[in-house]
């Protein structure tokens, strides 16, 4: 009998589905973190495949900062309604009461209070012992050395020196009470893999990933899209229409657009084939200080 050979994408798909099923079987109260971006959309698609024709055996959790793009909120609510997902939305109540925002308080404080602390609060509130995330190793250097099962202590902290071996796809999910595991089923995928899979599987994505004329300003070497009237224009800044798209999505004041003509998935894939820069070049939170992503993860970030 001739052995069937899986394509590169089907191998990645099979690995991710295996990981998702393993977590669902091994942990008592898992959750899938849903940030509404392309990686979350792929991860959610894989989870649906993993348990088809049944429903997802865990909820989705969106840690909301209040500063996502309007199109992201619309996409989130439409997706949850269309597939009848159990979507939990959590916002740090203390941060909301203090009016924490990226313009006044800066990216570091905004991210720490509204994202890191918000996530930790949500995980504690619902008692989740495992949380799926859409991070990939090719995105950023601290993520490159993180395991698929990322152990977190009772304070949700990550210690890069205290990681468990993962030989031959064997994952150690043994934890004590109060500890948890962050699980990254897309660890071995690249940005190009993600886009090719989205095209292959016809996965719905937020339209912001496709190039269109959008209102932007130039600030600190970044093209910031003006998404609502909370924009804090500085002297000399002028809003202008440019043909841009986003390679990564987050809070709109902290996420830079790139000039592009790629209006279709094949055009995005073609653009990725010649790209020499990281998709996270437009994320302001990665510029806070040297090693800022690893520091954030040590403190409990995604």
Curated annotation (Swiss-Prot):
Metabolic or biological pathway, per its Swiss-Prot or TrEMBL entry: Sulfur metabolism; hydrogen sulfide biosynthesis; sulfite from sulfate: step 1/3
GO molecular function: ATP binding; sulfate adenylyltransferase (ATP) activity
Keyword Isomerase attached: no
SUPFAM superfamilies the UniProt entry points to: Adenine nucleotide alpha hydrolases-like (SSF52402)
Keywords: ATP-binding, Nucleotide-binding, Nucleotidyltransferase, Transferase
EC number, UniProt record: 2.7.7.4
UniProt-listed InterPro entries: PAPS_reduct_dom (IPR002500), Rossmann-like_a/b/a_fold (IPR014729), SO4_adenylTrfase_ssu (IPR011784), Sulfate_adenylyltrnsfr_sub2 (IPR050128)
Reactions catalysed according to its record: sulfate + ATP + H(+) = adenosine 5'-phosphosulfate + diphosphate
Domain of life: Bacteria
Signal peptide limits: none
GO BP annotations listed: hydrogen sulfide biosynthetic process; sulfate assimilation
One Pfam family named in its UniProt record: PAPS_reduct
PANTHER family assigned: SULFATE ADENYLYLTRANSFERASE SUBUNIT 2
Function: With CysN forms the ATP sulfurylase (ATPS) that catalyzes the adenylation of sulfate producing adenosine 5'-phosphosulfate (APS) and diphosphate, the first enzymatic step in sulfur assimilation pathway. APS synthesis involves the formation of a high-energy phosphoric-sulfuric acid anhydride bond driven by GTP hydrolysis by CysN coupled to ATP hydrolysis by CysD.
Annotated family: Belongs to the PAPS reductase family. CysD subfamily.
Self-association and partners: Heterodimer composed of CysD, the smaller subunit, and CysN.
Protein name: Sulfate adenylyltransferase subunit 2
Species of origin: Zymomonas mobilis subsp. mobilis (strain ATCC 31821 / ZM4 / CP4)
């Amino acid at each position: 009998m001739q052995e069937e050979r899986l394509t590169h994408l089907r191998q990645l798909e099979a690995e991710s589905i295996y990981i998702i099923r393993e977590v669902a079987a091994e942990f008592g109260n898992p959750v899938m973190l849903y940030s509404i971006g392309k990686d979350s959309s792929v991860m959610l698609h894989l989870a649906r495949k993993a348990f088809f024709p049944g429903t997802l055996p865990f909820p989705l959790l969106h840690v909301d900062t209040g500063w996502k793009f309007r199109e992201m909120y619309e996409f989130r609510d439409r997706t949850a309604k269309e597939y009848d997902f159990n979507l939990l939305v959590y916002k740090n109540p203390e941060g909301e009461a203090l009016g924490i925002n990226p313009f006044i308080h800066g990216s570091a404080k905004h991210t720490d209070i509204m994202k890191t602390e918000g996530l930790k609060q949500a995980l504690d509130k619902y008692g989740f012992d495992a949380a799926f995330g859409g991070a990939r190793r090719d995105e950023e250097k601290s993520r490159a050395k993180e395991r698929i099962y990322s152990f977190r202590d009772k304070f949700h902290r990550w210690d890069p020196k205290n990681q468990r071996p993962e030989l031959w796809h064997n994952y150690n999910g043994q934890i004590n009470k109060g500890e948890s595991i962050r699980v990254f089923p897309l660890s071995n995928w690249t940005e190009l893999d993600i886009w090719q899979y989205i095209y292959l599987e016809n996965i719905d994505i937020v339209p912001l990933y496709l190039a269109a004329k959008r209102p932007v300003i130039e600030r600190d070497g970044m093209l910031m899209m003006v998404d609502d009237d909370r924009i804090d224009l500085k002297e000399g800044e002028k809003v202008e229409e440019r043909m841009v798209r986003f390679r990564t999505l987050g809070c709109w004041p902290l996420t830079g657009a790139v000039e592009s003509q790629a209006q279709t998935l094949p055009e995005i894939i073609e653009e990725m084939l010649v790209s020499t820069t990281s998709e996270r070049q437009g994320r302001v939170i990665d510029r806070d200080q040297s090693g800022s992503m690893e520091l954030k993860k040590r403190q409990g970030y995604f």
